[in-house]
Every structure is written in C-alpha cells, then in structure tokens.
Swiss-Prot record:
Gene3D superfamilies: 2.60.200.20, Winged helix-like DNA-binding domain superfamily/Winged helix DNA-binding domain (1.10.10.10). It is found in: Nucleus; Cytoplasm, Cytosol. PANTHER family: CHECKPOINT SUPPRESSOR 1-LIKE, ISOFORM A-RELATED, FORK HEAD PROTEIN HOMOLOG 2. It comes from Saccharomyces cerevisiae (strain ATCC 204508 / S288c). One of its GO terms (cellular component) is cytosol. This is Fork head protein homolog 1. The lineage of its organism: Eukaryota, Fungi, Dikarya, Ascomycota, Saccharomycotina.
C-alpha cells in the first residue's frame, strides 16, 4: 500500500492527540524500560549514540532504553552469542555474530533464546520462545518451547527477555501501549517525568488518570492526618507566641500541595518539648527537640516524626549552595536518622516520589566540576520567594498543619539568618538577615525544563515483499507510515 502523506491517520485510542504527542509517549516509555544490571552486548552493538543521519531499509523497529535495532529481514534471532568469547585469543579475527540481538553475556539468556518472524499466511509478526527461562510480553509470561504456539506481536508490545525490556514498533499500525503495561511502568514514568508528563498532554493525562497516582495522593492525605497531632505543641501551646508580626497580627501562610509522607511502622518518640529560648526578632520560633539523638544506632527502632518533605528540605538546607543531588539526599537521611539507615523498606522510592510530586522542590543543573550524573534538587524559587517576602514583611503566622517545607525554612532562617540558594536561583539570599528587612525582593521564578531522550525518526514506506525506506536521525521523532 502506498503512502500519500508523511503522517498516517489513525482512529485508535490516541487519535485525538497529535502525532508528536503519540510519539512523545512512545519515547517516554522506551526511556524507562528496564535493562540488565550488567552491560548487555546489544547496548553497544546498536547503541543510540552510534546513530547518524542516514536512510535505513527496514520492516520494523525493536528498541530498548539505550539501543535501537531495525528489522531488515523476515526473521530476527535473539539470544546470547558465544563465538566472540572463543575467538578473542586470535588477534585480528573478525567476529560474525550468529545472533541478531545479543543479550549476553548473562547466561540467563540461552544461545538461541527467541525469534521474531513474519507469518506470510496471517500477515503478522510473531514471537517464538526457545530459551528455558522464557519471556514476557506486556508483563505477562508467554508459552515457551519449540512446540508452543507463537505470540502475535502488535505495535507497542513490550518484550522482556532476561530482564532486558524492549518495545516492538510497526509503521503500519498505531503504536498502542496497553493500560496494563502503563500501570506497571507508572512508578518510573511518574518519577522520571513528574505529574506534568514532560509537557506532553497525552503522557500527562495518562499519569493524572492512573490508579498509582491516585493511591499515592490518598496515602499522602492519610499520612497528613496521622501527623496532625505531632504539630499540636507547636500550634496550640499557650506559652508560645505565634510567629508573625511582633505587634500580634498574624496572617496564615499558604503553600501549594505540601505532602507529609510519614510512613507506617516503627516506634514513635513519646515526648516532644518546646522551648522559647530561640526567639528571634521576627517572632518567637519554638524549638522542637527529639528525646534523644535519632542518628545514634541505639535509636534505630524509633521512627522520626519528620515527613519525607521535611527531611528533603533539611538535606537541601544543609548545603551552602542550597542544592543537593539525589544520592546526597539519601546519605543525609541515613546519616541523621538511624531508623532509615537500618530500614529494609524502600524508603528511597518515597523520597523520589516526594521530589516529583511536591511543587516545593525543583531540579537545578549541577555545579561546575561536581561529579555524578543527573541534576541537583533545590527549594523552588516560587516557594523561597513567597517565604522570604512574608518573612521580611513580618507576616508569617504560626505554621499551618502540613506546611513541612515552610516549617524547615522558618527554623533554618531563625537559626542562621539566611536561606542558601544555588547560583542559578533568581533570588539573592545574601541580603536576607535574621532581622526584619524592609527592602522587598523582586525576582522571577525560573522554571527548568528537561527534554526526554527521544526515539529515532523512521519513515517507512513500501510493501512487505520489499524493504522499506527509513530515515534515521538521532533524537528525532518516529513518523508512522504504511506497510502491508
């Protein structure tokens, strides 16, 4: 079937979205697919970094998180190549692999583990599994063995062999990723792209409508209710004045979507004492003390009363630059709270979810010369500016329940007289002192955007009896066209 336009029209579940939105979803899903803990050969053989602008004749595409294989024949083998191991001792030997997609050297993958074939009778692509450890398609185990029925592949199917996930894409079909797959991938999608879905309307709507996000928000609300009584000494003590104007006028500080992720389990500290010895010019700040040092090993069974948002804020404020990497946030929490240092639960996941969900935190580029990949985290410019403006105006009242980030900012400001900020921040913290500052701050909030890595653009045309033309451009989009 001939192609009359570069953008094929589809009438499927994503038809109301643009081709760019649909491709953005495929890109996002591909980038969060799992790979083996050890390097696999296909990641180097067909690495995305090796792609150059050129035309490729291909029937379809199979893509992992960091590699792309173009299907150029009617049968593709997947397995573990062993010839290169036997010929390494011969200098100058050119190794011709007998496997198309090499998932070695891990022996969990058989030498010939699977094959993807085009069935001329049915006109469909099928996956046959030979390896004893089997495989999954769309997160469900499929029949294994040479006599077992093959599994028909649709465009958007996610294949998992030996812990290496890959997505199968056809040009003649709309690439549909099943809801079941999206539910499995939702924690990674949310952690990587946030509730905004990397500014992709389709991905954003999928994340917002997910059961996972709804459950996360319900858990946050439940944890907030559990934390209510912890704030009672701070908000209702008769011998402590509320924080605000020295003349007694108070204005409640509003804050967007603060999340208190206090988790179940562990032993709560029994008593908390408040002291008015730390009064400052801007108001009396009660100092909350734990009954003992929670960093000591002996207190490993005592769950800290601080929420994850509070501990993240403490970690950020502990740095002179006001920004910190995710790994250093983990280290700060482990060093200061023995409960998490000895905990077997995946509390790091809760930290990542807080960073993604809480608008008080945002990413910032790492400092020049700072080691490690990824970005740093800081207090958002909007939250910092709102806090400092109200502090300088003397209009901070007693902290409302759930405002964990504000509480930590207030305690830090009372003790040190300033809030650290990274160089890229639009707010200059140097002029902020513990005394009431009459000069108002005028700053604009900088919003950092990150573009997700994208699949390579492929233009597929022609008949199944002949190979099809495919434009390959690094970090471009896939334009679905027609194959029959």
């Amino acid at each position: 079937m001939s192609v009359t336009s570069r953008e094929q029209k589809f009438s499927g579940k994503y038809s109301s979205y643009t081709a760019q939105d649909r491709q953005g979803l495929v890109n996002a899903v591909t980038c969060v697919l799992s790979s083996s803990s050890d390097p696999v050969a296909v990641s180097s053989d067909y690495s995305n970094s090796l792609s150059i602008a050129r035309e490729v004749n291909a029937y379809a595409k199979i893509a992992g998180c960091d590699w792309t294989y173009y299907v150029q024949k009617l049968e593709v083998t997947i397995g573990r190549n062993t010839d290169s191991l036997n010929l390494n001792a011969v200098p100058g030997t050119v190794v011709k692999k007998n496997i198309d997609i090499d998932l070695g050297p891990a022996k969990i993958v058989s030498r010939k583990h699977a094959a993807i074939r085009f069935n001329l009778e049915s006109g469909s692509w099928e996956l046959q599994i030979f390896g004893r450890n089997g495989a999954k398609v769309n997160f469900r185990r499929i029949p294994t063995g040479p006599d077992s029925p093959p599994t028909v592949l649709q465009s958007g199917c996610i294949i998992d062999i030996g812990g290496v996930q890959m997505i199968f894409i056809l040009p003649e079909q709309e690439t549909i990723i099943s809801d079941y797959c999206l539910n499995h991938l939702m924690p990674k999608l949310l952690s990587t792209y946030g509730t905004n879905g990397n500014n992709n309307p389709l991905l954003r709507n999928i994340i917002e409508g997910s059961t996972y996000l709804r459950e996360q928000r319900l858990q946050e609300e439940a944890r907030l209710q559990q934390l209510d009584h912890l704030h009672t000494p701070l908000s209702s003590s008769s011998d402590v004045n509320p924080i605000g104007d020295p003349h007694g006028d108070t204005i409640m500080m509003e804050e967007d979507e603060e999340d208190e992720n206090y988790t179940r389990g562990g032993i709560r500290p029994n008593t908390y004492t408040s002291s008015s010895n730390n009064a400052v010019t801007n108001g009396n700040v009660p100092h909350i003390e734990n009954p003992s040092d929670l960093s000591l090993d002996e207190n490993r069974y005592i769950k800290p009363p601080q929420s994850y948002a509070s501990m993240i804020t403490q970690a950020i404020l502990s740095t002179p630059e006001g920004s910190i990497s995710l790994a250093d946030i983990y280290k700060f929490i482990s060093d200061n709270y023995a409960f998490y240092r000895f905990s077997q639960m995946a509390w790091q996941n809760s930290v990542r979810h807080n960073l993604s969900l809480n608008k008080a935190f945002e990413k910032v580029p790492k400092r020049a010369g700072q080691q490690g990949k990824g970005m740093n985290w800081k207090i958002s410019d909007e939250v910092r500016r709102d806090f400092l403006n109200k502090w300088n105006a003397g209009k901070l009242s007693k902290i409302r329940r759930g405002a964990s980030v504000t509480r930590q900012l207030q305690l830090h400001m009372s003790k040190f007289g300033e809030i650290p900020a990274p160089e890229s921040s639009s707010i200059d913290p140097r002029g902020i002192k513990a005394q009431k500052v009459k000069k108002s701050l005028q700053a604009t909030s900088s919003i950092l955007g990150e573009s997700a890595p994208q699949l390579q653009r492929t233009q597929l045309t022609g008949q199944i009896s002949t190979t099809t033309s495919m434009d390959v451009t690094t970090n471009a989009n896939v334009n679905n066209s027609s194959l029959s």
